Amino acid sequence: MNPSEMQRKAPPRRRRHRNRAPLTHKMNKMVTSEEQMKLPSTKKAEPPTWAQLKKLTQLATKYLENTKVTQTPESMLLAALMIVSMVVSLPMPAGAAAANYTYWAYVPFPPLIRAVTWMDNPTEVYVNDSVWVPGPIDDRCPAKPEEEGMMINISIGYHYPPICLGRAPGCLMPAVQNWLVEVPTVSPICRFTYHMVSGMSLRPRVNYLQDFSYQRSLKFRPKGKPCPKEIPKESKNTEVLVWEECVANSAVILQNNEFGTIIDWAPRGQFYHNCSGQTQSCPSAQVSPAVDSDLTESLDKHKHKKLQSFYPWEWGEKGISTPRPKIVSPVSGPEHPELWRLTVASHHIRIWSGNQTLETRDRKPFYTIDLNSSLTVPLQSCVKPPYMLVVGNIVIKPDSQTITCENCRLLTCIDSTFNWQHRILLVRAREGVWIPVSMDRPWEASPSVHILTEVLKGVLNRSKRFIFTLIAVIMGLIAVTATAAVAGVALHSSVQSVNFVNDWQKNSTRLWNSQSSIDQKLANQINDLRQTVIWMGDRLMSLEHRFQLQCDWNTSDFCITPQIYNESEHHWDMVRRHLQGREDNLTLDISKLKEQIFEASKAHLNLVPGTEAIAGVADGLANLNPVTWVKTIGSTTIINLILILVCLFCLLLVCRCTQQLRRDSDHRERAMMTMAVLSKRKGGNVGKSKRDQIVTVSV
């Protein structure tokens, strides 16, 4: 290869530099993110607030801690810039830039729960055996066994003390309770024959007689039938136990601490010595009757009990009645007899049979009670939605009024497999919550308002020079307006009636009715009817809110109200506390908020949906009437006279022109007829005189 060929093949150095320049220029302009476009809705950003800077500093500090980087001013600045860059570069969802309208919304039956408190009405608890446990019976529970025991972590608030069962502060403690009936006997040595039932119940305080709250509890004595003074007598059939509610002579205190004072007026039967006419060495000289400790042990350890004494055995506080605890401090609430049905089902009940015999020892009467048990009855108690049971390590914090539980289980039924190392918290579905929501358009009560607004934007803003075009299509516009208004009113009505009820029923079934679908074949049962009444009562309250509120037309599952959300008045922390169910001085004032929203709804209910928009259409069309343009001009008599003369002159001119046009038309018609006659003559003018020719032509 000669030097000339090498020079020809080697690219010139200057050309290489010239080809690299455009690439460098393009690399400088290349970006990895999408091109940012300024939209019409884009607004100028406001300067950052102190709260935003404080939050940015916290995020930067947390980032440096996670990355184990020393916190210096330079690193803090770089971390803050990185966070701002990441937030700004996040993709914005469609329509988010235009979501500048925030209103209060009422969401009925959200997927949230709250604790049932002592101030709530009693809960329906169903049992599978009403012979041994009084109450409504239902042996079909749980409806969804595969869903029992689902794990959940809760952190909810409360205002009144919550209902909790178990060995924990703020919960009612479990204990064994006995109920005794007397069976007639004819044996000469047998004084009495007994049937006794033992089961789990609610544990009273040991020193309840000395407690200062006992005297105060006397004023809360319920109005009911007093308990009998004799042991109830029943037949020899051990499978029959008749429960009869009664009020004991004294109340027992189940709880008296910072969580409140809980009392119970049901009888607490137990064996003790009858010391009537005996010496002071009788054990009943104690202030508190001697309780048989053996009977309060585990129900599975002993199947035979023997009580022996030189003093007669008596059964105190007669009556076959279930516990009915109620709160009396710091507030007074209703009785809750359903709680005992949950505790008694946590372990099988044991049935005892025995008698009391009288013997002689050392020339003294000797009394012996023999009790034997060979029968146990397993039980199951269940609740139905909207109620559920949270089982686990429940912690109640009275200072912050919060309830927490990690790795808890959601149940609807309790049976003999329950472990009392856990606690039971009774919860229910939230009836509704108030939350602020954002919309990409202003609040509208009816779709007719939205449709007519769009129509008016394209019609009423036109110039008056299009008056003749508007008149040509005026009937079409009226038809569109009427159709839109009718459709808006119809859709508004359907949202609050058929569609809303259908969506509400579907959503509520998916959320809370998944475990308890009412069986149509057994719908005539009383218990199903009672539960349905409770279930529908909450729905009626929700519907009552919907009828009182004016909602946005484009929502059906919840109601967006016309009340604008004011962040300065209700900050998000208040909303968060409301969602947690906490009610304190810092919580959202729901009653005040409801009054404001109802007032705003009343203002919008004064007009039928679409009436305001239709009135705007009528005013706009009236402005396009040409008569109104000169209405203000013809306000004087002289101007009116001039206008009349001008109109008469124009009319005269039109008449003169019409007459002239008519004469010209007649002349042209005659000439055409003459020409037609002359063209039809075959011989022309031969044989006729000149006079005739002249006359003919002149015609």
From Swiss-Prot:
InterPro entries: GP41-like, HERV-K_env, Retroviral_env_glycoprotein. Residues 10-20 have a biased composition (Basic residues). Residues 1-89 form the signal peptide. Residues 90-632 are extracellular. Glycans are attached at N100, N128, N153, N274, N355, N372, N461, N507, N554, N566, N585. Residues 1-47 are annotated as: Disordered. Specific enzymatic cleavages in vivo yield the mature SU and TM proteins. Pfam families: GP41, HERV-K_env_2, HERV-K_REC. The record marks R465, F466 as: Cleavage. Two human-specific proviruses are inserted as tandem repeats with a shared LTR in most individuals tested. The telomeric copy is referred here as 'provirus 41574'. The centromeric copy is referred here as 'provirus 41575'. Belongs to the beta type-B retroviral envelope protein family. HERV class-II K(HML-2) env subfamily. Retroviral envelope proteins mediate receptor recognition and membrane fusion during early infection. Endogenous envelope proteins may have kept, lost or modified their original function during evolution. This endogenous envelope protein has lost its original fusogenic properties. The surface (SU) and transmembrane (TM) proteins form a heterodimer. SU and TM are attached by noncovalent interactions or by a labile interchain disulfide bond. This is Endogenous retrovirus group K member 6 Env polyprotein.
